[in-house]
Amino acid sequence: MRLRSTDSPLILIVAAALATSALALSNGAIGQGDAALAAVRRLDQASRTSNGELAPLSAEEHMRRAAIYFANRAFAEARAHWQALITRYPNDERVPAALFGIGRSFYQERRYAEALPFFEKLGRDYPNSREGRDGFYFVAPTLLRLGRAAEAASRYQAYIARFPAGERIADAYLNTIDTLREAGKPQEALDWIERTRQKFAGTPTATNALFAHLRLEISRGNWTKAVTLSDELLRSPLTGTMTSVAEVNYLRAYSLERLGNSAEAARIYQLIPDSIYSYYGWLATMRLMRLGQRAQAIARASRVRDQIRTSADFGETPYREIVLRVAKERGLDPRLILAIMRQESAFRPQARSRAAARGLMQLTIDIAQKYGPRANLSEVGEMDLYRPEISIQIAAAYLAELTKLFPQLPEAVVASYNGGEDNVARWLERSGKRDPGIFTAEIGFAETKDYVFKVMNYYRAYCTLYTAELLPQRPDEAQGASLPEKNASSIP
């Protein structure tokens, strides 16, 4: 459920940066699963000194154990080994990697104020190492998450000036644009859009900068300019970028709607194919209905409803009784829980991701320990997350909290479950809180964006096939033509 290593280059590609750091590569391929975690815990417990400190180990062994702990999100235990290495081997070549590990572990725990000094030290003391450059870079997203957007933008710009051939140079340009938007400096953001397009002309980075310009104008309600930019994007190759033809057409049609050109908007909406796996096609069908194009909307929805009913993918409702019970307790839609479960684990209770997410709902141990007490589970360990009832109970507690944060917008709830509610709050603010499709366009992580598309499509399918009690829908009651009413009500 947490952000993984395939994130987009658009704003805070944290996990990708961490996956490619020297720390992750310092010991080659090593086992980092549940068995490895249990083994290093036994070793540490058996060899601690009388005052409880870690036993003296080689620098390599400290790094090996820290990597295993970190891969399992046992952050405090990982930090103990990194700090031991720094203290015992201050001149070792692995010190920068250990410092970066400590910083990133605090970062992943959202302890940004504690992460910041480690990133600053890396950039200051080790600028010629990969960890030093990454540390310098990560000062920016850390400042952003501390609510210091203007300083964050300046730091991205400092990275560009100091490391013009740095590993994250394209990311720094793109992140500067969106961070300036968050700092309330749209004109400066426009200047950086032009710089980015010139420097990276003919590349996906330049196209992503153009897409950032489109999103900026939509957030400002500059609909005429948004239409012009949409047309320009549609003439550009979109492969390898953060957008698609369907998304750009949706944004173009939405902008035309806001300009009062309903006929042309309807024509563009009809160009977006609707299918069982087309999120923007689904939204386009809804917009057509609202524009009075009832016959076209019903025909599109009927085709998709037939696809869903003949698909073999949604014929069962696994763990129905548990899902219904916790959904009722938390005021959640059980069909959304099933949609998330399907995407997270394909209903496999023993599933485990590379990011140490476990079980049916792919919970990480830090989230489980935070929300376990709210599910009346006072002590939760890693292996408990493979138990279906525990996984569903804790996930429901978390989803209930997210639903309170983002009422009437399941896309934001789903995005939070994958990419973090702090990120979603920023994306929602940038979007202007207008429309689900506008919000989704602002999602800054490629994985999270794709995750939202998939989960919402599954949600549509389950709403078509099942009632809120997970009983089979009668054909005349199926609601595959639109989002559930609670979400549709948020669309102007």
Where does each model-flagged region fall?
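Short loop-to-helix capping motifs
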Residues: Q408-L409, G420
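Short amphipathic alpha-helical/adjacent loop interface patches that line ligand
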Residues: E421, Y459
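Active-site/ligand-binding surface loops and adjacent short beta/alpha elements
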Residues: I394
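Short, flexible loop segments at boundaries between secondary-structure elements
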Residues: T448-V452
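Acidic, polar-rich low-complexity tracts and alpha-helical solenoid repeat scaffolds
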Residues: R2-A17, S21-Y386, A397-E401, L405, ...
